[in-house]
A protein has these predicted regions:
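Outer-membrane beta-barrel strand-turn architecture
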Residues: 1-3, 40, 48-52, 100, ...
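Gram-negative outer-membrane beta-barrel transporters
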Residues: 3, 123-127, 146-255, 328
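Transmembrane beta-strands of outer-membrane beta-barrel pores
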Residues: 13-19, 60-66, 75, 112, ...
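Solvent-exposed loop segments that connect transmembrane elements
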Residues: 18-37, 68-95, 133-146, 182-212, ...
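Residues on the lipid-exposed face of transmembrane beta-strands in outer-membrane beta-barrel proteins
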Residues: 1, 44-48, 106-110, 158-162, ...
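Structural signature of Gram-negative outer-membrane beta-barrels, strongest in the C-terminal barrel
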Residues: 1-127, 229
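Repeated loop/turn-to-beta-strand initiation elements of outer-membrane beta-barrel proteins
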Residues: 4-7, 53-56, 114-119, 167-170, ...
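C-terminal beta-signal and adjacent terminal beta-strands/loops
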Residues: 247-257, 276-329
Length: 329
């Protein structure tokens, strides 16, 4: 618009077609699942330079994740008797809907202290419709993708990059996050439903629960990363680099059910060190220590929705010491 104000925008038109011929579980029945999707998405942002060192911005983005077909899903009630099962309403359907997001963000980027400190700060709000998640049906061994009608996410991200002296610099990154399922929605936790088998589908259906007010999956409320860097050219002319790092990952829920025995993943903090030395113009040496305190932590976990109800846990790596010798040709 002028030297201080800029408008950035872009749009995307998507056409998506899928078709699935599903025949499973002894081939007793076959389903042809197909659909066509069309969606227009885009982004618009306004940037404003307050001065030569400071820029603010405001943006709106509409995003889209296409829907699709499930390989397993609840039997329609009309088909229940063909399999000797008791009728129960479906919770997982042949087709799951497209997920959409309206994302709002406001931010500030500025250089301070004669450009020795850079600050990047942003606040955001995301509104989801038909959020896709892994769900379970009352029918045995039937799970797939379902949709949560409405949910929200809001947060704040702060980043500082600073020069302390000719040799020392640092970076600090903080993120704060709040999430919530805002619509009334009932889903079946397969951890609870696993106690019941063929012929007990109506009982499984009664175990469905409202997840309104629950937190979204895999969304830590607080993350932090701090790094202190040292870099110096020695009297020999060789370059020496050293880095000390602290990484904190906050606790979160691994599923939208927020089951305290299965879904709660604890926070952890780890410490890392690295040292790099330029032996010659072509040879370099790196010494690295990761997770120095040998912290026990869970990186992620996943609970199967297709019948066995098992939960797999991915742990963070234990304490590690590594050395690396490099040669530049």
């Amino acid at each position: 618009i002028n030297d201080s104000v800029r408008v950035i925008t872009g749009f995307r038109y998507t056409e998506d077609t899928f078709s699935s011929d599903v025949t499973n579980f002894f081939g007793l029945n076959s389903y042809l699942i197909e659909d066509d999707l069309e969606k227009t998405t885009g982004r618009i942002a306004i940037e404003y330079d307050l001065d030569d060192d400071t820029m603010t911005y405001l943006s709106f983005t509409k995003g889209f994740k296409p829907g699709g077909s499930n390989l397993t899903f609840g039997y329609p009630v009309d088909d229940e008797q063909n399999f000797g099962a008791n009728p129960a309403p479906q919770l997982v359907f042949p087709i799951f809907e497209s997920e959409t997001i309206d994302a709002y963000e406001i931010g500030l980027k500025t250089d301070l202290l004669n450009s020795r400190l850079r600050a990047n700060i942003s606040a955001f709000f995301y509104k989801y419709e038909n959020l896709q998640f892994q769900s379970t049906d009352p029918d045995i061994y039937r799970g797939g993708v379902a949709n949560i009608p409405e949910s929200e996410m809001s947060g704040l991200e702060i980043e500082f990059l600073g020069i302390i002296s000719n040799e020392f610099s640092f970076d600090l990154r903080l993120s704060f996050l709040e999430t919530e399922i805002t619509s009334e929605y009932e889903a079946l936790d397969n951890i609870r439903a696993e106690l019941y088998f063929f012929g007990e589908e109506p009982i499984r259906y009664t175990l469905r629960e409202s997840i309104k007010g629950n937190k979204l999956a895999k969304s830590p409320e607080f993350n932090a990363n701090f790094g202190l860097m040292y870099e110096k050219v020695l009297s020999s002319g060789k370059l020496l680099k050293a880095t000390a790092e602290v990484v904190h990952r906050g606790d979160f829920q691994q599923r939208v059910f927020n089951n305290p025995f299965v879904d709660a993943v604890d926070e952890y903090t780890i410490y890392n060190l690295s040292l790099s030395y330029e032996i010659s113009d072509k040879i370099g040496l790196d010494l690295i220590a990761l997770n120095i305190s040998d912290e026990d932590g869970v990186n992620s976990s996943m609970t199967d929705v297709f019948g066995v109800a098992g939960t797999g846990i991915e742990l963070i790596p234990p304490r590690q010491f590594m050395g690396r010798l490099s040669y530049n040709f």
